[in-house]
Amino acid sequence: MSAFQPTIKRRESTKIYVGNVPIGGDAPIAVQSMTNTRTTDVEATVAQIKSLERVGADIVRVSVPTMDAAEAFKQIKQQVNVPLVADIHFDYRIALKVAEYGVDCLRINPGNIGREDRVRAVVDCARDKNIPIRIGVNAGSLEKDLQEKYGEPTPEALLESALRHVEILDRLNFDQFKVSVKASDVFLAVESYRLLAKAIKQPLHLGITEAGGARAGAVKSAVGLGMLLAEGIGDTLRISLAADPIEEIKVGFDILKSLRIRSRGINFIACPTCSRQEFDVIGTVNALEQRLEDIITPMDVSIIGCVVNGPGEALISDLGVTGGNKKSGYYLDGERQKERFDNEDIVNQLEAKIRAKVARQDPKNRII
């Protein structure tokens, strides 16, 4: 790891708990995703939640649009370990029902639940059962009067919408909540979060909504969330992709890993390759990413195909290889080793060295 580590001053916020996961304050930034199965298909939803948990999801959100879905949620909750957020709109009775079934957080907009007595019923229930709430403002569903006032979604419009909902909870003396102000436009989302970060002390849930497919969505999310996280804004995040939800978790951790905020698993440093490469760098990286998905312990591994940049990268990596003629140089903790790797068997040799280092360094294979 490079000795140059700029300090990111985290925004001060109150701490809440989603199940056993702390959000805000000095807690690690939590990574979450959302199921895209039919919630009433209990078997498929449970399977997807467990797959998300295996790749590191701290929290999983589940849409609960109907009472049938609420009954399914009860069965789902009993079969998984990761905290679950119920995504609820319009019908306050669904929120009350999933609260009975042990939901860990309610994602609602107080403004679309209906009359204040209904909002109060949800808040009172959340308070009694110690369930936090996420206020989720979205540029695509901004209130009609704010659309008319501002002409279009603007940072000020999203802020005003969020503060309206915050005011409702404040009036009901409820402070166990987090807030999001999502937009599909990067600059709109970033500026909205900046304004909100100055206006309230509650934890912020980050996201670029409807970001797009796997590649474009990951790029948009990395740009937008990267700007905010580098400024110390954000306490939990979701990468919204039109892709397998597992990719949302992987991209989320990749963003945090890139900013040295939170690491999970192997951070591969690999060259884009050119005619100087002495072994198949791309194939090596792809194979190792698949083989080492079970590794949680953070580790920097450099895989460079030649001696131009290879030694320099290896010096600041936990483990590294530098391409050579038929055999490649091997570095451990920044020091060149006498042992060399056979280029034809580099994947197997490198995997063995990585697993051996994990076993020595972190036998329990933990995340930080």
Swiss-Prot record:
Key word Metal-binding present: yes
Reported cofactor(s): [4Fe-4S] cluster
Keyword Acetylation: no
Pfam family, one: GcpE
Positions annotated to bind [4Fe-4S] cluster: 271, 274, 306, 313
Catalytic activity: (2E)-4-hydroxy-3-methylbut-2-enyl diphosphate + oxidized [flavodoxin] + H2O + 2 H(+) = 2-C-methyl-D-erythritol 2,4-cyclic diphosphate + reduced [flavodoxin]
Cofactor binding notes: Binds 1 [4Fe-4S] cluster.
Any Gene Ontology biological process: terpenoid biosynthetic process
GO MF annotation terms: 4 iron, 4 sulfur cluster binding; 4-hydroxy-3-methylbut-2-en-1-yl diphosphate synthase activity (ferredoxin); 4-hydroxy-3-methylbut-2-enyl-diphosphate synthase activity (flavodoxin); iron ion binding
Coiled-coil annotated residue ranges, if any: none
Record keywords, A-Z: 4Fe-4S, Iron, Iron-sulfur, Isoprene biosynthesis, Metal-binding, Oxidoreductase
Enzyme Commission no: 1.17.7.3
Known pathway: Isoprenoid biosynthesis; isopentenyl diphosphate biosynthesis via DXP pathway; isopentenyl diphosphate from 1-deoxy-D-xylulose 5-phosphate: step 5/6
Top-level class of the enzyme under EC nomenclature: oxidoreductase
UniProt signal peptide: none
Matches recorded under Gene3D superfamilies: Dihydropteroate synthase-like, Sulfite Reductase Hemoprotein, domain 1
Function: Converts 2C-methyl-D-erythritol 2,4-cyclodiphosphate (ME-2,4cPP) into 1-hydroxy-2-methyl-2-(E)-butenyl 4-diphosphate.
PANTHER family, A to Z: 4-HYDROXY-3-METHYLBUT-2-EN-1-YL DIPHOSPHATE SYNTHASE, 4-HYDROXY-3-METHYLBUT-2-EN-1-YL DIPHOSPHATE SYNTHASE (FERREDOXIN), CHLOROPLASTIC
Family as reported in the entry's similarity comment: Belongs to the IspG family.
Protein name: 4-hydroxy-3-methylbut-2-en-1-yl diphosphate synthase (flavodoxin)
Annotated source species: Haemophilus influenzae (strain PittGG)
Gene name for this UniProt entry: ispG
